[in-house]
């Protein structure tokens, strides 16, 4: 199943608002100039930008990624445990700024946009206990967050997906959930319903040798198209991490193949670079313009 602009979830990372000197606070107000929401744009480790969440949204990203550790009862956002700081949390960087933006934009992440921002939450600490804390946090934003009840989705402005140390059994057992499960390519034929596993993500280098130098081998191109077709047939979206991300012809070549295959989310740390590439080369964005 191919997701349309209407149904595409966004992954979001926000700005720190408390004590972290290296992280600028996110602005609740929408940007002054119109920004085109980019269906495929995913901000990898979004919290590492100067203005978490805000920078991604200023470049039209519809999916952002936050690494989360449960420390002293807080859902702290950082790549490594030693970098966690009190008050720099999922709520302060993402949920609160997104709720403010939701209110400022009349119920949408981007004014006039009817899609859902995907917030990819990568659990770094113990899966079950951290997920329980995430679940509690998401439930505090019922008007903002997508939920699933008895297998039926009620889409809202932000859709959370759990990656990293994912407690599948605990998530599957919930009658009402406020997050989806991020699967792996080994889950493509698992039979897990798309309402539980809306996304399948994996490491590019574990499945492909091509990194953009020369033409893509035909066997690998066929493999990529088959993966995406299989995922879409089950209603799953597709994302790869560890794709080339240094500006240059190799990155452009890989991004071109990802678009041609219908990969749903393109992973990057270069917000401006991916924005410019998608606006110039993604047929979806050209149709929307």
Identify what each model region corresponds to:
Residues 1-29:
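Secretory targeting and sorting signals
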Residues 49-54:
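A structural motif detector for short, solvent-exposed N-terminal "entry" segments of globular domains
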Residues 29-48:
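Short N-terminal segments immediately surrounding and downstream of signal-peptide cleavage
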Residues 32-38, 55-62, 69-289:
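Catalytic cores of phosphodiester-bond hydrolases, prominently lipid phosphodiesterases
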